[in-house]
């Protein structure tokens, strides 16, 4: 399995040399709240979208059936 959402966020943060505090501020939440979400991995779709925007990224969510059909 691939990286978790939190691992992907950390990787992008590292590449962009930004801190958890910077990302929290840019995404409109407290550092503590973001840290808790990163630890627990409990992100809503809205959280992910806001964090991606703050990181200058986009998010694509795809559903693919077992037979390979993308919906």
Q: What do the PLM-derived regions correspond to, one by one?
A:
Residues 5, 16, 44:
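Flexible coil/turn residues that form the inter-helical turn or adjacent wing/linker of helix-turn-helix
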Residues 10, 21, 49:
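Residues within the helices of the helix-turn-helix
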Residues 13, 24, 52:
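The alpha-helix within a helix-turn-helix
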Residues 13-15, 39:
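Short amphipathic helical patch at the helix-1/turn junction of helix-turn-helix
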Residues 17-32:
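Short alpha-helical DNA-recognition segment
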Residues 28-43:
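Recognition helix of helix-turn-helix/homeodomain-like DNA-binding domains
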Residues 40-53:
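Short, basic-rich loop-to-helix N-cap that marks the start of a DNA-contacting helix
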Residues 56-71:
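Short C-terminal boundary/hinge segments that cap the last helix of small helical domains
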